Amino acid sequence: MAKKNILVVEDNHAILDVITLILESEAFNVVGLNKGADFINHVNELNPDVIIMDIMLPDTDGRILLKHLRADVSIAHTPVLMISARYNATNYMLDEVAADDFMAKPFNIDELMDKIYALLKKSSH
């Protein structure tokens, strides 16, 4: 079976490094980005199976990136796990464009992996 590709958009380098190490230890291909502009420029070419995205990025709001993703027919189906230290699931799911799942920071590694495997089942890749 081919390795699954996971795109992580997170501005905190320590969190990005931890998520990358965890996912690579589970045999995923991981690409990490620090800025929303990088996401917009590279998401189509990366063609991820799952996206993990922080809501609060230095150059944009992750919810704006999610709207951009959902508007692009070629990648609109990609499952997205939003993460945030400032929002909780109740507040986040009230937004008009909800992600496939949400996780508050700091997070539990087992919970992160459970959510990723559940999202991979949704992925059409």
Give the ranges of each region predicted by the language model:
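Two-component/phosphorelay signaling modules centered on CheY-like receiver
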Residues: H13-V31
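Acidic, metal-coordinating helix/loop segments flanking the phosphotransfer/catalytic sites
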Residues: G32-V50
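The feature encodes the CheY-like receiver
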Residues: P58, A76
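C-terminal output helix
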Residues: F107-A118, S124
